[in-house]
């Protein structure tokens, strides 16, 4: 291999790793409540360098800066508990102000991945109440498909993350894996089929119900990042 091609290969590898880091970062924010350890990581010199690099893209800067502002204020047990309550109210309980983080509640496998009737209202490692119909979609066909994807890639959901495979945190973590193991076409096909088909609706619901706004900015950043990344994959 020539010196030039070696450099090109290294650049591609570094680019893939950088994209995977972003997906894992977003996955971690949807997987569980923000902890003091995560705040410490993101407000450290290395964490700030990462966030500043993300903010260099004009379409991401507003959301990144708002998240950073919120992180700085998470400097007490009380502030973390308040944010944890927001997370719980949005993603862990059923209710008028909750938002489903599961792809299967937005998409229908029978309709070829097209959006179905909408609800109004870090996850993998290597090796009003919803109706009965909506509850049945949990651990449904999209969960089964994601589980098969994970198994085929020798991945599994963390034992301390008791959620279906079509949870947004699992999907984002799986895309991080694809970033470093698969070609652009496979990545793009997966993103367009399993995330972009419902992410806009999810983001709108979070913006409607998250009065604390931290997860509004996280959802906005996720949606804008996916748009940036899919454009990148199309041009690759």
From Swiss-Prot:
It is found in: Cytoplasm. Involved in the biogenesis of TorA. Acts on TorA before the insertion of the molybdenum cofactor and, as a result, probably favors a conformation of the apoenzyme that is competent for acquiring the cofactor. InterPro entries: Chaperone_TorD, DMSO/NO3_reduct_chaperone, HscB_C_sf, TorD-like_sf, TorD/DmsD_chaperones. The keyword Chaperone applies. Its main location: cytoplasm. The gene is torD. Keywords: Chaperone, Cytoplasm. One of its GO terms (cellular component) is cytoplasm. Belongs to the TorD/DmsD family. TorD subfamily. PANTHER family: CHAPERONE PROTEIN TORD, CHAPERONE PROTEIN YCDY. GO terms for biological process: protein complex oligomerization; protein folding. This is Chaperone protein TorD.
